[in-house]
């Protein structure tokens, strides 16, 4: 019977000559045959694509032999379990309806009717991305740079949650600090031959990486008694470059830097074989770059035993003793390096084990997960999977749109959007596990998940930097740059993942409000989970950006730390996704930082995070989103009130540190919050800013640019303190030069270094007046707070020179005061240096008064 149907199908002639040609031409390529043995669920998704509750025009059924369109009865016989009662009702309605037109002008597969009596059709959605692929393997094999050798092995790890909490290592102070001896006194047992380093740039990629035979890089064992470990890292996310044997059971390890750079060594992931059970091994990583690490306060490395996974179903676990993080004693004139050393014992002889900085989550893991979603007949109805773009290497950057179908166009347009992304930094695999937990929940059939899908449109980019994840980078893409510093880029070809993400959000903002944007990250120097946000100067939304983090801390009190959150917008963070989206109009724009270590809070105090802990945070994000948007605003109002109380306490703490006391009731909210908060301790990626490496090499090849390139680049200061000191020194030099033709300024400069505070004089002219009166005050000198920057003010500011020469010479400058936005109030009067313990005693009638502290500005009104 099937043979007869297929013969009849192949001999079918279509009325349209072009369609008839394409039909007969493509059937030999298997497109119309679609054997069900290789497409286990494709029919289900095509049925969803075709038989979504919509009325379709004649000819809109596909012309594949598993979708026979001669009669609807054949369709129902082929897929009796796929059609719901609603689907049957729609099919009957189509059969009965006289509007099923047969005109050649309306014979199309792309137009559908929302209602039977509706005269205007609409375009149908495109087919599912995975509709023609098997669930037995990933959609697309990863593409590697052509310089990278890749072993032909499938690395897979099981998920496992330890039965007991994994506590931090408690340093004893007597841990051994091995001296680094190197390959001069040791034996190299593993080394990558060709590693793309600084000075080179990405050119092309291919599946499987480098052409040719894969070399055996590990040493050859001399017999069964040879106990040398066999190292390997030429697989997804692996990054071991060299292993040197310096003792019977001691090895020095060198990590490969991010490709095409000489920086960013923190993530590690490698394999060892030929283990011995009763021996104590010591591993020392010798080229880490961060001076501070969670390894110094008890974090342990992760180990995975293949035999334990096979026999006992045990996965990744924390292992390590005698853990020490210290500075490398080798001085090669370059940037200082740091070492991590630990000892361990393997559970089995002749085992295959893996070590990692954190639980790996590879590009293949993501593709398998997304493929399972696409092949799920229920989830695929409200989760649309698309390709946002291709990365530099040609790997797909996936975009998920998750929302329940709306009953009317008006209901669909009223939905707000939520944008979530992860893995812009490839070494921060904890962000992928949080994203995995979020997707598990939002795609589930729980009532809360269904409610969220009813009221929101979720745009999810689960892996922004697939190239970096594949090759084992810690921070950069194949452009050799940190993508989270280039959200303002216009270089679409160099940073496609970021450019298309920003463009997608920009288009989304044009059609609906984006309630929340959150980019998931990992943090290597702080425990717990916390958020970085952006403080808004809009009084209407004052403190509102802090409500969501506070709610999240209440929903996950043993994981999330609100005290670690920061909302200061620093100049060095202007290119991050958080700040760029905030400036595009998304008030609730966040970076979620998840520790590589564990928690110091509540019931999980001093324990490492597991995979389940990170997944649960994804659930808590959904739960908090429901609280945040609850029509009953009781929780929201309570959080706002609590935030005001916390802010008052922080201000009082600042004042106490200055040795002052003050009643702030009624006026404390005028204090700029950016002056209260300290700067974030996020990673410094300034060395990874700038144009892509490829463009720099193109410029270097130009003959007329040689003279420019000979000038050495100005050496960057390593710490913020040094930058501030240099800025203050250069500023003082400019002040001294300004006094040459202005003797009246000499007294100002002489008092500059005496006292740290000054008062605003009522006679001080506005900045625009001063600019016209004194042309020497140029735009550079009048920059700072008046231009909206959030950096801490310098020691003094040129716009305060005239104010210094007040009637009270004891007061000198330390920072520029914040101008009041209330233009109806008069200028602030002079203030005496004696402070009242209750209310500010210098407040005069009919005048606004401002007391100025270093980095703290307070307004009081009568």
From Swiss-Prot:
Protein's UniProt name: Cytosolic carboxypeptidase 2
UniProt binding sites for Zn(2+): 425, 428, 521
Cofactor list: Zn(2+)
Pfam families to which the protein is assigned, alphabetical: Pepdidase_M14_N, Peptidase_M14
Entry keywords, A to Z: Carboxypeptidase, Cell projection, Cytoplasm, Cytoskeleton, Hydrolase, Metal-binding, Metalloprotease, Protease, Zinc
Secretion signal, residue range per the UniProt entry: none
Source species of the chain: Mus musculus
Gene field: Agbl2
Biased composition annotated in UniProt, kind: Basic residues: 711-721
Ranges of compositional bias, category Polar residues: 813-825
Domain of life: Eukaryota
Purpose: Metallocarboxypeptidase that mediates deglutamylation of tubulin and non-tubulin target proteins. Catalyzes the removal of polyglutamate side chains present on the gamma-carboxyl group of glutamate residues within the C-terminal tail of tubulin protein. Specifically cleaves tubulin long-side-chains, while it is not able to remove the branching point glutamate. Also catalyzes the removal of polyglutamate residues from the carboxy-terminus of non-tubulin proteins such as MYLK.
Lineage: Eukaryota, Metazoa, Chordata, Craniata, Vertebrata
């Amino acid at each position: 019977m099937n043979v007869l149907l297929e013969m009849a199908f192949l001999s079918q002639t279509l009325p349209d000559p072009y369609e008839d040609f394409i039909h007969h031409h493509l059937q030999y390529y298997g497109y119309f045959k679609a054997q069900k043995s290789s497409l286990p669920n494709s029919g289900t998704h095509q049925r969803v694509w075709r038989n979504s509750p919509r009325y379709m025009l004649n000819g809109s059924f596909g012309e594949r032999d598993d979708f026979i369109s001669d009669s609807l009865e054949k369709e129902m016989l082929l897929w009796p379990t796929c059609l719901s009662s609603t689907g049957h009702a729609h099919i009957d309605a189509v059969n009965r309806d006289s509007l099923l037109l047969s005109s050649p002008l309306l014979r199309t597969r792309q137009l559908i009717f929302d209602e039977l009596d509706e005269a205007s059709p609409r375009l149908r959605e495109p087919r599912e991305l995975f509709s023609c692929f098997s669930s037995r393997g990933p959609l697309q094999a990863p593409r590697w740079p052509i310089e990278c050798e890749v072993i032909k092995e499938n690395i897979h790890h099981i998920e496992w949650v330890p039965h007991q909490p994994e506590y931090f290592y408690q340093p004893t102070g007597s841990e051994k600090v091995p001296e680094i001896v190197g390959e001069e006194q040791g034996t190299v047992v593993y080394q990558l031959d060709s590693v793309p380093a600084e000075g080179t740039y990405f050119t092309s990629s291919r599946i499987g990486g480098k052409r040719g035979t894969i070399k055996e890089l590990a040493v050859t064992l001399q017999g069964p008694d040879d106990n040398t470990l066999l190292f390997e890292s030429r697989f997804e996310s692996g990054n071991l470059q060299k292993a040197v044997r310096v003792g019977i059971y001691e090895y020095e390890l060198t990590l490969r830097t991010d490709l095409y750079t000489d920086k960013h060594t923190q993530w590690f992931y490698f394999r060892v074989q030929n283990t011995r059970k009763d021996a104590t091994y010591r591993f020392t990583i010798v080229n880490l770059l961060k001076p501070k690490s969670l390894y110094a306060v008890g974090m342990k490395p992760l180990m995975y035993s293949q035999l334990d996974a096979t026999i006992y179903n045990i996965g990744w676990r924390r292992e390590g003793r005698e853990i020490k993080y210290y500075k490398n004693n080798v001085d090669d004139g370059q940037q200082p390096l740091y070492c991590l050393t630990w000892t361990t014992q393997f559970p089995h002889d002749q085992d295959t084990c893996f070590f990692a900085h954190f639980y790996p989550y590879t590009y293949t893991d993501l593709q398998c997960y997304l493929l399972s979603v696409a092949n799920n007949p229920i989830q695929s109805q409200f989760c649309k999977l698309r390709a946002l773009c291709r990365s530099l290497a040609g790997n797909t950057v996936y975009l998920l749109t998750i929302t329940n179908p709306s009953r009317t166009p008006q209901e669909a347009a009223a939905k707000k959007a939520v944008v979530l992304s992860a893995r812009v930094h490839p070494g921060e695999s904890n962000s992928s596990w949080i994203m995995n937990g979020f997707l598990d929940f939002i795609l589930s059939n729980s009532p809360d998940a269904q409610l969220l899908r009813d009221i929101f449109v979720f745009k999810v980019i689960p892996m922004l930097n697939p190239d970096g994840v594949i090759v084992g980078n810690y921070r950069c893409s194949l452009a050799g740059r940190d993508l989270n510093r280039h959200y303002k880029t216009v270089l679409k070809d160099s940073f496609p993942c970021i450019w298309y993400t920003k463009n997608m959000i920009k288009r989304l903002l044009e059609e609906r409000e984006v309630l929340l944007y959150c980019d998931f990250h990992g943090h290597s120097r702080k425990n717990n989970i916390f958020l970085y946000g952006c403080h808004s100067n809009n009084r209407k939304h004052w403190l509102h950006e802090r409500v969501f983090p506070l709610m999240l801390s209440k929903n996950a009190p043993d994981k999330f730390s609100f005290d670690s959150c920061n909302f200061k917008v620093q100049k060095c963070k202007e290119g991050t996704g958080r700040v760029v989206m905030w400036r595009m109009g998304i008030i609730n724009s966040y970076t979620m930082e998840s520790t590589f270590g564990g928690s110091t809070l509540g019931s999980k105090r001093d324990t490492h995070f597991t995979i389940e802990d990170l997944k649960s945070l994804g659930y808590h994000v959904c739960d908090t989103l429901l609280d945040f948007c609850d029509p009953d605003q009781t929780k929201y109002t309570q959080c706002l009130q609590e935030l005001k109380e916390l802010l008052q306490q922080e201000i009082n703490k600042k004042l106490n540190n200055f040795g002052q006391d003050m009643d702030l009731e009624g006026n404390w909210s005028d204090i700029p919050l950016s002056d209260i908060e300290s700067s974030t301790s996020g990673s410094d990626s300034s060395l990874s800013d700038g144009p892509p490496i490829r463009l720099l090499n193109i410029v270097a090849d130009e003959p007329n640019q040689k003279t420019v390139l000979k000038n050495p680049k100005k050496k960057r200061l390593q710490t913020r303190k040094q930058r501030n000191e240099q800025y203050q020194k250069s500023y003082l030099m400019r002040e001294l030069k300004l006094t040459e033709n202005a003797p009246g300024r000499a007294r100002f400069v002489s008092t500059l270094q005496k006292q740290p505070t000054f008062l605003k004089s009522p006679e001080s002219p506005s900045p625009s007046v001063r600019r016209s009166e004194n042309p020497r005050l140029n735009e550079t000198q009048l920059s700072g707070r008046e231009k909206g920057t959030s950096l801490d003010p310098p020691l003094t500011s040129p716009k305060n020179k005239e104010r210094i020469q007040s009637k009270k010479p004891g007061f000198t400058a330390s920072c520029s005061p914040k101008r009041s936005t209330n233009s109806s109030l008069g200028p602030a009067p002079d203030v005496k240096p004696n402070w009242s313990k209750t209310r500010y005693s210098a407040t005069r009638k009919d005048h606004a008064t401002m007391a100025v502290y270093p980095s703290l500005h307070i307004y009081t009104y009568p």
